[in-house]
Amino acid sequence: MMAAPRRPFFRRRKTCPFSGAGAPKIDYKDIKLLLRFVSERGKIVPSRITAVSAKKQRELARAIKRARFLSLLPYVLK
């Protein structure tokens, strides 16, 4: 008896956390929000991992860089 063919597992694509009603606004002063998108070493996490849209990823990167420049966020975390 043959086993039934397996269907491939599709991981559901997460939606952008910054789109939709009630979504937080990207602001360079909101350090708690920005830290969610920075790795433990201080690097900006890519959008394929965080599921942020391309437009919002650019906004996020700009906000993180602004916060770093103003010493609100460190460039490197230890």
From Swiss-Prot:
GO terms for cellular component: cytosolic small ribosomal subunit. One of its GO terms (biological process) is translation. The keyword Ribonucleoprotein applies. PROSITE patterns: RIBOSOMAL_S18. Keywords: Ribonucleoprotein, Ribosomal protein, RNA-binding, rRNA-binding. The keyword Signal does not apply. It holds the Pfam family Ribosomal_S18. GO terms for molecular function: small ribosomal subunit rRNA binding; structural constituent of ribosome. It comes from the Bacteria. HAMAP family: Ribosomal_bS18. Belongs to the bacterial ribosomal protein bS18 family. Part of the 30S ribosomal subunit. Forms a tight heterodimer with protein bS6. Binds as a heterodimer with protein bS6 to the central domain of the 16S rRNA, where it helps stabilize the platform of the 30S subunit. This is Small ribosomal subunit protein bS18. It comes from Rhodospirillum rubrum (strain ATCC 11170 / ATH 1.1.1 / DSM 467 / LMG 4362 / NCIMB 8255 / S1). The gene is rpsR.
